[in-house]
Swiss-Prot record:
Its EC number is 1.13.11.27. Binds 1 Fe cation per subunit. The gene is hpd-1. Fe cation binds at residues 182, 267, 350. Keywords: Dioxygenase, Iron, Metal-binding, Oxidoreductase, Phenylalanine catabolism, Repeat, Tyrosine catabolism. Residues 17-148, 179-339 form the VOC domain. Key enzyme in the degradation of tyrosine. This is 4-hydroxyphenylpyruvate dioxygenase. The lineage of its organism: Eukaryota, Metazoa, Ecdysozoa, Nematoda, Chromadorea. Disulfide bonds: none annotated. The keyword Repeat applies. It is an enzyme of class 1 (oxidoreductase).
C-alpha cells in the first residue's frame, strides 16, 4: 500500500466537492422510489412532462449532502439514453462536481486534450442561474462541472419540488448517511493507468493511495487500485483494474466490465457517523449486504488483541451485522457492501464510517473478495470462457 503527497496547488480553479450523481435507468420514477425505500433517501426535486421537460424525466433524491438523480427517456426515439441502457443497463452516467472558476478549469481541460461533451452553458430560472460543462472520462462516464454561485433553487434550473410526499418514507427507520465518501471506477485490464493519467492531466488530481495485486488477491482473483483526488482531497476517485490469477478465475472487476460492457462506476461509498445504527436501519428496510464468515472476526479479534488500537463499537454487533473493520496505528474504518442494486452484477453501494483513518479497507479486500466470489459462484460467474453462455474455462 502506497500513499502520496498532494504537491503544489494547481493553478486552475477549484473542484470543491461531489455535487450529485446522475444515473441512466429504464424507469426513473421506480428507481428513485427503490433507493428511497431501501437506502433512506427522500425525493426532493423533479423534472418531467409536468415541468415542461419533453425529452427525459429526472427524479432527484437526497439524504443530507448526498444527491442522486435518476433519468429515463420519455420518447421511444431517444437513441442516446436507449443505447446507453441497452449497453450498460441501469448505472451511473455522470458524477457531477461542484467547482469554482469553471472557465479556467475548462480552458485547461481543452488544452490538455479532454473530450468536451458539452461546452460551458448557462441555464436560468426564477431562482437564478448556474453554469456548467461536461467532460468525458473513462468509458461512457461523464463529469459535469457545475458552478452554482448564488443559485437559490432547491436543486437546478428546470427542476420543481418533487410531487411525491415523503410521508411514507418518514415511517421507516432513519438511516443517517451524510455525504459521498468516494466513487469507484472499474477498468478493463491495463486500462487503470490511462484513466488515472486522465485525472492527473485533465483535472490536475493527484495520487492519494494505491495497492497492487501482490497485496490484494485471493486464491482465485486479484486487483490493482489507484485512488486519485483533488488538491483539497474532498473528491476521491479510486480506479480499479483486474489482475490475472493462477486459477484463471473471473475477477469481480472483470465480471463488472463484462456485464457493464466496459469501464464504469462500480460502487459509490456513502459516509455515516454511526454505521451500526445505519446498517440496522438499512437491513430493516430490506437492504441486502454481503455476508462475512465468522473466521474473519476470529482473526480480527486476535489482531486487535495485540494492537494498541481500540475499537469503540461492540464487536459482537459488528459481527452480527457483517460489518468489516480495517485499522492501523492511527485509527480505523468500518465498512459494508451491498449486493448489486440491479439484476446485472454491476453497481453496488458501500457504507463507511471513518475514525481517523483515510484508507480504503485494504486489510478487508481479501475477505471482501472471498465474499463476492461466493456470490459469483451462485451466479455461475467465477469461471467462464464466454459471459453469454457461462461455460467454464
Amino acid at each position: 500500500m502506497t500513499t502520496f503527497d498532494r504537491g503544489e496547488k494547481p493553478d486552475i480553479g477549484t473542484l470543491v466537492a461531489f455535487d450529485h450523481v446522475r444515473f441512466v435507468v429504464g424507469n426513473a420514477k421506480q428507481a428513485a422510489y427503490w433507493y428511497c425505500a431501501n437506502f433512506g433517501f427522500e425525493p426532493f426535486a423533479y423534472k418531467g412532462l409536468e415541468t415542461g421537460s419533453r425529452i427525459t424525466a429526472q427524479h432527484a433524491i437526497k439524504q443530507d449532502k448526498i444527491v442522486f438523480v435518476f433519468e429515463s427517456a420519455l420518447l421511444p426515439d431517444n437513441t442516446e439514453l436507449g443505447e446507453h441502457l441497452v449497453q450498460h443497463g441501469d448505472g451511473v452516467k455522470d458524477v457531477c462536481f461542484e467547482v469554482e472558476d469553471l472557465d479556467s478549469i475548462v480552458a485547461h481541460a481543452k488544452a490538455a486534450g479532454a473530450t468536451i461533451v458539452r461546452d460551458i452553458t448557462e441555464e436560468s430560472d426564477e431562482n437564478g442561474s448556474v453554469r456548467f460543462a461536461t467532460l468525458r472520462t473513462y468509458g461512457e462516464t461523464d463529469h459535469t462541472l457545475l458552478e452554482r454561485k448564488k443559485y437559490k433553487g432547491a436543486f437546478l434550473p428546470g427542476f420543481k419540488p418533487h410531487p411525491m410526499p415523503p410521508t411514507f418514507f418518514h415511517s421507516l427507520p432513519r438511516v443517517g448517511l451524510n455525504f459521498l465518501d468516494h466513487c469507484v471506477g472499474n477498468q478493463p485490464d491495463l486500462q487503470m493507468a490511462p484513466a488515472v493519467e486522465w485525472y492527473e492531466n485533465i483535472l490536475k488530481f493527484h495520487r492519494f493511495w494505491s495497492v497492487d495485486d501482490s497485496m490484494i488477491h485471493t486464491e482465485y482473483s486479484a486487483l490493482r487500485s489507484i485512488v486519485v483526488t483533488n488538491f483539497e482531497e474532498t473528491i476521491k476517485m479510486p480506479i480499479n483494474e483486474p489482475a490475472s490469477s493462477n486459477k484463471k478465475a473471473v475477477s469481480q472487476i472483470q465480471e463488472f466490465v463484462d456485464y457493464y460492457g466496459g469501464s464504469g462506476v462500480q460502487h459509490i461509498a456513502l459516509n455515516t457517523t454511526d454505521i451500526i445504527t445505519a446498517i440496522e436501519a438499512l437491513r430493516a428496510r430490506g437492504c441486502e449486504f454481503l455476508s462475512i464468515p465468522s473466521s474473519y472476526y476470529d482473526n480480527l479479534r486476535q489482531r486487535l488483541s495485540v494492537s494498541s488500537m481500540k475499537i469503540k463499537e461492540d464487536m459482537d454487533r459488528l459481527q452480527k451485522l457483517h460489518i468489516l473493520v480495517d485499522f492501523d496505528e492511527n485509527g480505523y474504518l468500518l465498512q459494508i457492501f451491498s449486493k448489486p442494486c440491479q439484476d446485472r452484477p454491476t453497481l453496488f453501494l458501500e457504507i463507511i464510517q471513518r475514525q481517523n483513518h483515510q484508507g480504503f479497507g485494504a486489510g478487508n479486500f481479501k475477505a471482501l473478495f472471498e465474499s463476492i466470489e461466493l456470490e459469483q459462484t451462485k451466479r455461475g460467474n467465477l469461471f467462464y470462457e464466454n459471459v453469454k453462455d457461462g461455460q467454464h474455462k
